[in-house]
Amino acid sequence: ISEALKSIIVG
């Protein structure tokens, strides 16, 4: 579950 967080952080 790191891609989802990265997606939200990146925007």
UniProtKB/Swiss-Prot annotation:
GO CC annotations, alphabetized: extracellular region
UniProt KW Secreted keyword: yes
Tissue: Expressed by the venom gland.
Subcellular localization: Secreted
Similarity comment: Belongs to the bradykinin-related peptide family.
Function according to Swiss-Prot or TrEMBL: Amphiphilic linear alpha-helical peptide that shows histamine releasing activity from mast cells. Also shows low hemolytic activity, but no antimicrobial activities against all bacteria tested (E.coli, S.aureus, and S.cerevisiae).
Protein name listed in UniProt: Annulatin
Taxonomic source organism: Campsomeriella annulata
